[in-house]
């Protein structure tokens, strides 16, 4: 059949190019957990900060689990119940922060871009704190399972505030929410540093400076033990002690004391590589 060219005389033929479908933008996904419990105002402050930039699934301990570190429940069964808090479906895990991460990854089959833990009520500064913190412990567990994690903690001015009910804590999270979103946004844009397994972020109660990349101080508290007597005259003990006033420039403790946001890259490799030669002399010579 002859082509009818009427109507195109005097014009160059128009090439018909097949349009390729536009690449779909894949929205990042975040597993959000903590150690203060699924009802904590700090966790929901983090949720509010993150939901505009990612799909967020909350999987957190059902109850307060501060200072449990990376402990894991292996002698009792775990229950995960779906609840609705603040109008949002969430999973409440009757276990530790580490349990919540494992349940999220392996029972709920989540495949998050990253795990975010926090916002913890109270700072998690120094080696001493990150080894006992359930907030940091959850991020460490996530990274050990192949998903990089960021832990967020907000300094309290009175250490006793850490023991208030996290469901009704009066701390302001306005500045912290902006920092949480900005930090996660930056990491999503640039990618997680390959040599860091966890990023530990500590936000001062009153931010006076900017971001500071820091190293871990050794200790946050002067360790002490207080002996008391119960009504029957039998002794019992409280582990307590005042905070270090400082720990030297470059440390996370110093940074937060100065009003800066401390960002500490943490690795799972606890090997003391620089000590290998001395160890060889002791055991292999």
What is the meaning of each model-derived region?
Residues 25, 168-171, 190-285:
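C-terminal accessory domains and tails appended to enzymatic cores
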């Amino acid at each position: 059949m002859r082509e009818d060219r009427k109507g195109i005389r005097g014009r160059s033929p128009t090439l018909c190019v097949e349009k390729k479908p536009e690449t779909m933008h894949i929205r990042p996904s975040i597993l959000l957990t903590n150690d203060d419990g699924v009802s904590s105002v700090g966790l929901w402050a983090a949720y509010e900060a993150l939901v505009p930039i990612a799909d967020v699934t909350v999987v957190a301990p059902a109850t307060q689990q501060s200072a449990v570190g990376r402990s894991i429940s292996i002698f009792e069964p775990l229950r995960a119940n779906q609840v609705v808090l603040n109008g949002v479906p969430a999973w409440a895990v009757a276990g530790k922060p580490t349990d919540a991460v494992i349940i999220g990854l392996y029972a709920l089959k989540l495949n998050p871009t990253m795990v975010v833990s926090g916002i913890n009520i109270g700072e998690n500064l120094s080696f001493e704190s990150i080894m006992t913190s359930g907030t940091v412990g959850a991020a460490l567990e996530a990274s050990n399972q192949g998903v990089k994690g960021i832990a967020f903690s907000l300094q309290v001015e009175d250490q006793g505030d850490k023991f208030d009910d996290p469901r009704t804590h009066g701390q302001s999270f306005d500045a912290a929410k902006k920092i949480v979103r900005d930090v996660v946004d930056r990491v999503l844009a640039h990618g997680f540093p390959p040599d860091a397994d966890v990023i530990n972020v500590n936000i001062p109660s009153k931010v006076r400076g900017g971001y500071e990349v820091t190293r871990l101080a050794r200790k946050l508290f002067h360790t002490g033990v207080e002996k008391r007597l119960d009504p029957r005259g039998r002794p019992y003990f409280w582990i307590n002690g005042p905070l270090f006033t400082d720990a030297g420039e470059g440390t996370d403790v110093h940074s937060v004391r100065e009003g800066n946001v401390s960002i500490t890259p943490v690795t799972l490799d606890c090997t003391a590589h620089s000590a290998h030669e001395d160890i060889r002399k002791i055991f292999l010579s």
